[in-house]
């Protein structure tokens, strides 16, 4: 069994908690940095983010042992999050809540509304409103990747 399959098995123990890692894994966007029975550290290349899932702080530290630097990281509990923040000097690392829509059919969009990717013409607006990351180069990359979306009504971004 290869490392990606072993990582998947670990993450599928709690698929809702690790939805942010399983999605990129399914899309072939991650590589396994380190893997143990008690956790996994992935690197999401397009997102330029390390993604840590660990059963304990000790496991998290061991999984990160070979990583010299991180600029963007996610963790799934406060203790390993605090470790990443302190070890890699990530002052913007903070808690978040995830939600997942698990149905196969997309939610209906009311008449007159549209969800669509945002292009470079929306860069300034994204930079002002996207508080998680304020690095302009990162935002340009995410726009180019087609992963920034907006809700429009009558052609106007809401």
Question: Which residue stretches match the model-derived regions?
Answer:
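N-terminal charged segments
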Residues: 1-68, 78-81, 132
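Short amphipathic alpha-helix that is part of the acyltransferase structural core
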Residues: 1-19, 95-137
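Hydrophobic alpha-helical segments and helix pairs
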Residues: 61-110, 114
